[in-house]
Amino acid sequence: IEKWWGNRWDRINGLLMVGGEILAKMTPPYNLTGKDFEKVGITFASSGNGYQKGTKSSRFGRIVNSIGGSSSTYTCDYLWWNAGITAVALVGGNCNNGENCGADYLNLNNSAGNANWNIGASNFFSYRSV
């Protein structure tokens, strides 16, 4: 479950969509190209949006793999994606639209350069023992 309250988007550094294919990386260092990321086994053609229907569970977690649900069926959360860009995952939602939030809401529709008042910072702390 990510961002249960849905009050702002947060970036997930280790989850990208590159050319429609979802890639994941569980540990740093992260990048914005997908280099050294692993294929999750989920690909979306073109671009689109819709209520989530199916999900795939793997060691990367549970990730949406199909749309066709509604606001009252399946996960009841939405998915936006853009297969034409390298998109950094946004999770949570935003407080200015009640339908743009939820425990499973996923946005793969924006590049890392996207900035808005409703997008939080990507906090990351790496501890190195000396």
List each model region and its residues.
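A short, polar/charged loop-to-alpha-helix boundary motif
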Residues: 18-28
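C-terminal, surface-exposed recognition/capping segments
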Residues: 7-17, 33-130
